[in-house]
Each structure stands twice: as C-alpha cells, then as structure tokens.
Amino acid sequence: MKKLLLLASVLAWVSGVFAEEKPKLIVGVVISHFYPEWMDMYANELSDNGLKRIMKQGARVNMNYNYFYTQTGVDHASIYTGMLPTEHGIVSRAWYDRLRRKRQYSTQSDRYTEIGDQQADSIKSLSPDYLQTMSLGSAMKWNNPMSRVFSIAMNGDEAVLSGGSSADMAIWFSEKTGKWVSSSYYRSELPEWLRMYNTWVESDHFVNKGWMMLSDEDKSAARIRLTNHFY
C-alpha cells in the first residue's frame, strides 16, 4: 500500500506514549502514492519545521497491512481503524448488494443529503454507515467525549472513512461546484467559517495559477530513482 501516514504529534504520541502530559492535538496526514524513501531522497529540499522535523524527531514503524486489493477509502479505513478490510467492512470502493440487488458504494447513503453551496434534498450524500469498527477518532471520543474530530480531504470517501463514525464533521471538495461540502450525517448546515471560506475561494482561484516547482526540472528529475521500485 503506497500510502504514508504522518502524525504531526508523533513526538508526544509515539515517542512519549506514557508521558504525563497528553497531546492536545493529533494530526493525521495520508499522502496517496507516496513512497517512504522519497523523504530521504528529497530531505535536502524539505523545510526544517515540516516533514524533515518528523524525519529527525519522529518514529518510523512498519505499517504494512496484509491485504492485496488497495483502493481509495479501503486504505483510509484500514489506516484509521488499524484493521483489515474483512474486519472494518470496507472491502472495496463499491460492491454488489444481493439483498437490494444493486451496486452499493462504500460511503453512499440515501438517508443523508449534501450540505454546501448546492444544498438540496435531491442531492444524496455520504456517511460512514458501512464502517463496522472503531476508528482513531471514535476511540478519542470514547476516551474523552469533549474531543473534537474533523476530517478533510479532496475525495468524499477519504474524508468520511478517515473521520470514522463519531467525527464531528467530514469535509471534502466538490468537483461540481469547486467548493467544500459535507453531509447532513454530521450537521444540518456548514459552519460559518467554512461558508465564508467558500465565498472567498472560487473554483478558478487556483486553476488560473501555474504549477511552480521549487527546483528546476532537471534537478528534480535527477533525484528520482526508479531502480529500486517494482515498475
């Protein structure tokens, strides 16, 4: 599974599991198609307070999961529950429901509607109803009901399954509107701060900007080593 889970609070949470002071913030970041060796390869290009800090002060552990079929959503559910697809229930992005005789997507729900710029009862939304086990966010809520859990991603499946069943809110990017949306599973409307952000960020705000590399093309290409990869 070519994904890397980075915990920004790794110093407090991993290196000091039994520390007296509990961390007030845990940030989980999943980067799809990210090879761990790239962190060493591009170490000189990284900022001191970003990934390089995690490399120097964090902990690296083997988090391979014993399953072959990797997909968006399946992997995120495995990462944040610590379980295999056969255990957490998200075995694929979609499967055939024999009882209802229809194709069922892992997060698609007829019980909830989308909330956001095009909020309407006719727009069906997403929920973690098919997630069958406790996630990291749910465990935090169980340990401390005052904990707040938010999940944000470009893809709805990623946001919903990373947040888990007890998340305060999952937010994802709508390709139709170019704005951030959510589901009525969490609340009836978007929070004020997100509505203001959606007003400021138009869909062409980033589209009209060019992709500027931090280093020239030749320098970056020279650092990419494919000899140790399977392809």
Residues covered by each model-derived region:
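A structural signal for well-ordered alpha-helical segments within the folded catalytic domains
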Residues: 24-25, 49, 74, 131-138
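Beta-strand elements within well-structured catalytic alpha/beta cores of enzymes
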Residues: 23-35, 54, 79, 140
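His/Asp/Glu-rich, glycine-adjacent segments
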Residues: 84, 92-231
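Solvent-exposed loop/turn segments at secondary-structure junctions
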Residues: 32-36, 60-61, 67-72, 85-86, ...
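Short, structured active-site-proximal loop/turn typified by the sulfatase FGly-forming signature C/S-X-P-X-R
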Residues: 40-88, 148-150
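Boundary at the C-terminal end of the N-terminal hydrophobic targeting segment
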Residues: 17-21
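Sec-dependent N-terminal signal peptides
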Residues: 4-13
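Second-shell loop/turn segments in exported
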Residues: 35-41, 64-66, 121-127
